[in-house]
């Protein structure tokens, strides 16, 4: 009889340990919407100081130990994050999924992890000053925009300061 209780208690302890580990994993990184991340009319871009809601297109946010920093575009956010002093793994990067939002009014319910996003650079779409990076969770949606409005599909690891600088120079000539 004691053996049965001993085995049952070991099994129960194992199950409880698994549940605790699963709960810890889920609490570690909530989606942007669950974290309460939203853009408000008075929010200013962390880089340029402009009012974020004054511009169409996707926005960006970096969430880390130092709080939340909001940006008027994914390009502004990535330009900031690519600086050596800001390029940290513990910073969560969010952008609007433009496959699920209207260009003129991105929906904060559709913020996605920038590390998994597809970006279209070089399109004819207008956004905040400088480089326009349209962000998508779905490759097909990104490819569709690139076909219809021009541009090239990239992943986060394809984007660096040099690319942002070159695209910014080209963008200022065409505006």
Predicted regions and their residues:
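Short metal-binding segments enriched for Cys and/or His
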Residues: 75-86
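N-terminal targeting pre-sequences for secretion and organelle import
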Residues: 150-175
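Thiol/selenol-based redox catalytic cores and closely related redox-interacting motifs
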Residues: 91-156
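Short, intrinsically disordered, charge-biased short linear motifs at domain edges
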Residues: 29-37
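Post-signal-peptide N-terminal segment of Sec-exported extracytoplasmic proteins
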Residues: 37-70, 75
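Bacterial signal peptide processing site
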Residues: 24-27
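Short, charged, surface-exposed secondary-structure boundary motifs
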Residues: 81, 103-105, 163-167
């Amino acid at each position: 009889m004691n053996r049965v209780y001993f085995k049952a208690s070991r099994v129960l302890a194992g199950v409880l340990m698994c549940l605790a580990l699963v709960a810890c994993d889920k609490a570690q990184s909530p989606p942007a919407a669950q974290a309460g991340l939203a853009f408000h009319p008075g929010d200013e871009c962390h880089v340029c100081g402009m009012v974020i809601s004054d511009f169409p297109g996707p926005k960006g946010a970096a969430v880390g130990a130092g709080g939340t920093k909001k940006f008027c575009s994914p390009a502004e956010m990535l330009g900031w994050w690519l600086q050596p002093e800001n390029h940290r793994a513990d910073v969560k990067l969010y952008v609007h999924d433009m496959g699920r939002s209207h260009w003129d009014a991105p929906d904060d319910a559709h913020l996605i992890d920038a590390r998994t996003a597809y970006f279209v650079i070089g399109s004819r779409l207008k956004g905040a000053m400088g480089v326009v990076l349209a962000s998508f969770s779905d490759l097909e949606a990104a490819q569709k925009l690139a076909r219809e409005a021009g541009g090239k599909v990239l992943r986060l690891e394809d984007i660096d300061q040099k690319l942002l600088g070159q695209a910014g120079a080209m963008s200022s000539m065409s505006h």
